[in-house]
Amino acid sequence: MHTKNLFYSRTQQITQYLSALLMMVILTRTSISSAYPLFAQQGYENPREATGRIVCANCHLANKPVNIEVPQAILPDTVFEAVVQIPYDLQLKQVLSNGKKGGLNVGAVLILPEGFELAPPDRISPELKEKIGNLYFQSYRPNIKNIFVVGPVPGQKYTKITFPILSPNPANNRRAHFLKYPIYVGGNRGRGQIYPDGSKSNNTVFNATASGRVKKIIRNQKGGYEIIINDGSDSNEVVNLLPPGLEPLVSEGESIKLDQPLTSNPNVGGFGQDVAEVVLQDPSRVQVLLFFFASIILAQIFLVLKKKQFEKVQLTKINL
């Protein structure tokens, strides 16, 4: 009986250990390989709020520029480029989740008007394929064809991201019209500062959770620090944990206040959003416009010829 209980206890311990190990692997892979698109997709049905704010800004707190370039006008059922630029200093290094320094990744979310979608591979020209490179565009939702995310990808290689877009044809799509449409984009470089559950990453400032005097600063073997704050009473101590990659600004014996920064801000990245407009042009209107321009040019030519003919007649009368 004792042997059976011991076997059951050991089995339970091994199961718990393997479960914890598996969870750590999943979390580690998630945070590295699919951080920002995954967080947005899991937490929000639509990446653009009613206020116009793109939800990526909830985790990436710093504001940085992002630009999008599209043609001014396009014809129905036509493939065109939407070029997203995410500029930053390529020499910068960020704090990684393990506390080490590394290069910045970039990512983007593109919100197209309804009816616009990603161009199928057989419609993409070789020149456009070369601009796209090895990027993989993922639908924000399986049933949504006009919102796409890409990344994280190495920023050293992809500060410019080219999306191949296929315009709708109002003749086949009743929801499409010959109008001016907005295209929204959000792009970030670097890791976020806040996780979806509200907890901080090691890529942001950590503040004191209590006022008092710094009693002790302990450096952990696996990285990070424990800052022990005494609030004035002998028995009440508050421990502030700093994750790996952050260095304390305070020292032992120093008096600090509530919410005082314990670290500097390590973040070198940020998020930004932009909007561009594209006109879905009616081909018949283009033909009418071309005919109008051609008629004006012909009228000008006939006017010049008529003027020269009149001058010849006048010159002949003078000679007579």
Curated annotation (Swiss-Prot):
Keyword Mitochondrion found: no
Xref: Gene3D superfamilies: 2.40.50.100, Cytochrome f large domain, Single helix bin
Pfam families per record: Apocytochr_F_C, Apocytochr_F_N
Reported cofactor(s): heme
Transmembrane segments: 286-306
Keywords attached to this entry: Electron transport, Heme, Iron, Membrane, Metal-binding, Photosynthesis, Plastid, Signal, Thylakoid, Transmembrane, Transmembrane helix, Transport
PROSITE patterns: CYTF
One term under GO cellular component: chloroplast thylakoid membrane
Cofactor: binding comment: Binds 1 heme group covalently.
GO annotation, biological process: photosynthesis
Record: residues binding heme: Y36, C56, C59, H60
GO-annotated molecular function: electron transfer activity; heme binding; iron ion binding
SUPFAM superfamilies the record matches: Cytochrome f subunit of the cytochrome b6f complex, transmembrane anchor, Cytochrome f, large domain, Rudiment single hybrid motif
Membrane topology, from the record: Single-pass membrane protein
Span of the signal peptide: 1-35
Predominant location: plastid
Matches recorded under PANTHER family: CYTOCHROME F (PTHR33288:SF10), PTHR33288
Family note: Belongs to the cytochrome f family.
HAMAP family hit by this protein: Cytb6_f_cytF
Known partners and oligomeric status: The 4 large subunits of the cytochrome b6-f complex are cytochrome b6, subunit IV (17 kDa polypeptide, petD), cytochrome f and the Rieske protein, while the 4 small subunits are PetG, PetL, PetM and PetN. The complex functions as a dimer.
Functional note: Component of the cytochrome b6-f complex, which mediates electron transfer between photosystem II (PSII) and photosystem I (PSI), cyclic electron flow around PSI, and state transitions.
Protein name per UniProt: Cytochrome f
Source organism: Cuscuta gronovii (Common dodder)
Record gene name: petA
